[in-house]
Amino acid sequence: AYTRQQVLELEKEFHFNRYLTRRRRIEIAHTLCLSEAQVKIWFQNRRMKWKKDHKLPNTKMRSSNSGSASAGPPGKPQTQSPHLHPH
């Protein structure tokens, strides 16, 4: 398990870089008294969490946007306007 301080530093680094160079991974591991493997695996897991977290809001936004556009009258002018542009 990681200490709060280690997680804080790892999160801070992740905020700036989702991928580490080997040199940076060695520096972080040394600074936080972790092995390179621990840092590498933490970043792999964190990237997966990040991808999951960022997929959900996008799909929700898409479904709500498409739902609102097709549900009401505002959808009609939107469907007509693309026909006006090509001609």
Curated annotation (Swiss-Prot):
Report biased composition (Low complexity) as residue ranges.
63-73
* Pfam families in alphabetical order: Homeodomain
Swiss-Prot/TrEMBL keywords: Developmental protein, DNA-binding, Homeobox, Nucleus, Transcription, Transcription regulation
Q: What is the disulfide pattern of this chain?
A: none
Q: Does the keyword Nucleus apply?
A: yes
MF terms (GO), sorted A to Z: DNA-binding transcription factor activity, RNA polymerase II-specific; RNA polymerase II cis-regulatory region sequence-specific DNA binding
Q: Where does this protein bind DNA?
A: 1-54
Query: Which Gene Ontology BP annotations are present?
Result: anterior/posterior pattern specification; embryonic skeletal system morphogenesis; positive regulation of transcription by RNA polymerase II
The cellular location(s) given in this protein's UniProt record come to: Nucleus
Q: Which InterPro entries match?
A: Antp_homeobox_Deformed_sf, HD, HD_metazoa, Homeobox_CS, Homeodomain-like_sf
List cellular component terms (GO).
nucleoplasm
Polar residues biased stretches: 77-87
Q: Which family does it belong to?
A: Belongs to the Antp homeobox family. Deformed subfamily.
Q: Which PANTHER family match?
A: HOMEOBOX PROTEIN HOX-A4, HOMEOTIC PROTEIN DEFORMED
> Protein name, please?
Homeobox protein Hox-A4
Q: Which organism is it from?
A: Ovis aries
**Gene this protein is translated from:** HOXA4
